[in-house]
């Protein structure tokens, strides 16, 4: 499962956070990637969710839109129902990182990676470079014989050339039953005329040995009839042997 949870933006972030927790609880993911998740005063949303849901958790700051509160830092989070064997941050470009957690599953290792590529419309070169760096990391891990999943907000639709390096080494887990728009103009938190509106920009990607059996969007109206974030969450069912 992956979700850009929109930090503390908006007037009802505390209420949104409760709805985010309930949505995740209902899905019971084995692994959860978060983007635009907050940390402040030594506490993080990722750790709070981990405590509530009984999951291991880790947070890493990364380049994100700035929160109005200067004491709030936004970044990436990973939660897992399995113990995290190793955690590492990988620099993709100035200020932007990928957060990688290695999880031991029997005799095998699964690397669960999350990132949030640059969101600005004119940052095509930056997104391409970041996707290329991610692809190099993925290829290195695959060469070891390990399974790899990348889950995150890539800020580009699937036919965008910026994502070509990453989609060359991983398969898109989205099942093409419907368009899967994660950044929708029907979402009341979306600003009017956003350049990425009505696009699928949030992904779960996996190596070719991991075949999804289902995929879906969640997070539509769990907050008193409103979505808990400006993005919808992506869930994929992927059996891991």
Feature map (PLM): residue ranges:
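Metal-dependent phosphoester-hydrolase catalytic domains
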Residues: 139-148, 156-241
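Active-site beta-strand/loop signature of hydrolases that rely on acidic residues for catalysis
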Residues: 1-5, 20-43, 79, 101, ...
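Active-site-proximal segments of metal-dependent phosphoesterases and phosphodiesterases across multiple
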Residues: 10, 117-134, 158-167
């Amino acid at each position: 499962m992956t979700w850009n949870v929109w930090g503390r933006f908006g007037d009802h972030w505390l209420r949104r956070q409760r709805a985010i927790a309930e949505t995740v609880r209902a899905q019971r993911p084995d692994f959860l990637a978060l983007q635009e998740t907050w940390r402040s005063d030594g506490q993080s949303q990722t750790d709070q969710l981990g405590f509530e849901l009984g999951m291991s958790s880790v947070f890493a700051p990364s380049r994100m839109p700035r929160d109005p509160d200067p004491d709030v830092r936004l970044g990436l989070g990973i939660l897992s129902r399995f113990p995290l064997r190793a955690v590492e941050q990988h620099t993709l470009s100035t200020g932007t990182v990928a957060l990688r957690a290695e999880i031991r599953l029997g005799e095998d290792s699964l690397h669960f990676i999350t990132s949030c590529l640059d969101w600005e419309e004119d940052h095509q070169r930056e997104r391409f470079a970041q996707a290329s760096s991610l692809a190099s990391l993925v290829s290195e891990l695959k060469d070891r014989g390990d399974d790899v999943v990348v889950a995150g907000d890539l800020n580009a639709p699937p036919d965008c050339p910026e994502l070509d390096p990453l989609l060359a080494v991983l398969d898109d887990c989205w099942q093409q039953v419907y368009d899967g728009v994660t950044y929708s103009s029907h979402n009341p938190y979306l600003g009017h005329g956003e350049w990425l509106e009505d696009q699928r920009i949030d992904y779960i990607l996996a190596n070719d040995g991991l075949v999804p059996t289902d995929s879906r969007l969640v997070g539509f109206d769990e907050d008193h009839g409103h979505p808990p974030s400006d993005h919808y969450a992506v869930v994929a069912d992927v059996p891991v042997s």
